[in-house]
């Protein structure tokens, strides 16, 4: 039964590959007044990918395949980490953070991604693209580490063994010193972009997204004063007129612009706790309820509905991962400082189906 279910999901995912958009993930960073860094991220998809949180210890052995059935890169994790993995797997992270405060976000990338070729003599450097996020968290403590160490890899196109296709993705990486980069693969080359804004959505490529922001330099949080034309006075119709023209749809370019405006103008908060609250408010504006974004197969029989399956908030400074899910908007907390990352087994934390969605405070009346 489980095998049949996974096969059906694979068929749906293959269908999604041929149509746009397939995922509307959104990620951003906020800095508190005391320097604490909070990263917020939403995960949208049209298929239930059966996510759990996995906790991976130090010295956990991993091995990548290589093209042609050869053995690829093998490594043991230097750092323990926690992140979101699908279908019961202990790799293939979409999101996560390690004990050094390094965090990744793996986002769908609707463009002409071309991974690296692997020469016969380079098999031991070959890393399946589905394992890149795991490799980063397990081996790197900073953005500079990633920039340096990734040059030794050959990241190749590899079909996910569960879904039977190779997801087109790009990756954003944050560290606890406010570093941030975007990694995209184009024409078989690894392109790394410094990302001082700390924002990313999906397609087009990151440099295009940054250039597109120039179209919106007139956005402001200030309500404009009245205009006088031909002796007539025209005041703004209401507060918020300074944001007129801010795109409100769910396409990746529009979400990128909206992120830039919200993170630019929202009041900076003094500490991690209140910045976490601000991050929730910002990410709420990108939430996709079921039915709002649909895709239909050519035979009009299959409709996929993209939803915000889960959202994460990572405190890079204090090494705390928070998350909420579509079925339960209550925030849950995972403190990486409390884990003993020794041992070799991967632990799991269930994300969905957790009760106590509503807190009854009736009896607190006095």
Where are these regions (language model features)?
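Positively charged n-region of N-terminal signal peptides that target proteins for export
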Residues: 1-4
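Structural recognition of the beta-strand scaffold that forms the well-ordered cores
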Residues: 38-40, 103-106, 172-174, 182, ...
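Aromatic- and glycine-enriched pocket-lining scaffold segments that form the walls
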Residues: 143, 147-185
